[in-house]
Amino acid sequence: MARFLSILLCFAMATGLAAGIRYPDRVLGRCSTHDLSKMEIDTNLDGVYSPHRSFCTCGSGEVYFTAKDRRNHSNYRVYVCGMPTEFCTAENPVRDPKKGNRWLQCRCRQYKMVIYRDWLVLCE
């Protein structure tokens, strides 16, 4: 219940900020926002991946989103690590036996997150 309320509060903050946000990575208190339309991820695998609107939280509270390879349209899971603008990848990605996709995996700090339009809001 506390987790739900904190995410709801974070969403309320994002809603209030949406009209005034002009630049990515603006920080308000302990929440930070990121303009997803401008974000790209440079991995150590096959080049640059563009994020799509597929966001989830792991059971541990880790935050990740799915990125798509522009060339072969493979989906990759990218975690938000450390500071919200830092992304980490695994040296040896594993393959999802059900979908056949390779997923990037690593340990990350815990963040709560919410999506508002094209903005990702992360709250510690």
From Swiss-Prot:
Contain 2 disulfide bonds. Expressed by the venom duct. Keywords: Cleavage on pair of basic residues, Disulfide bond, Neurotoxin, Secreted, Signal, Toxin. It is found in: Secreted. Residues 21-99 form a propeptide. One of its GO terms (cellular component) is extracellular region. One of its GO terms (molecular function) is toxin activity. It comes from the Eukaryota. Residues 1-20 form the signal peptide. The keyword Disulfide bond applies. Disulfide bonds: none annotated. The cysteine framework is XIV (C-C-C-C). Probable neurotoxin. This is Conotoxin Im14.2. It comes from Conus imperialis.
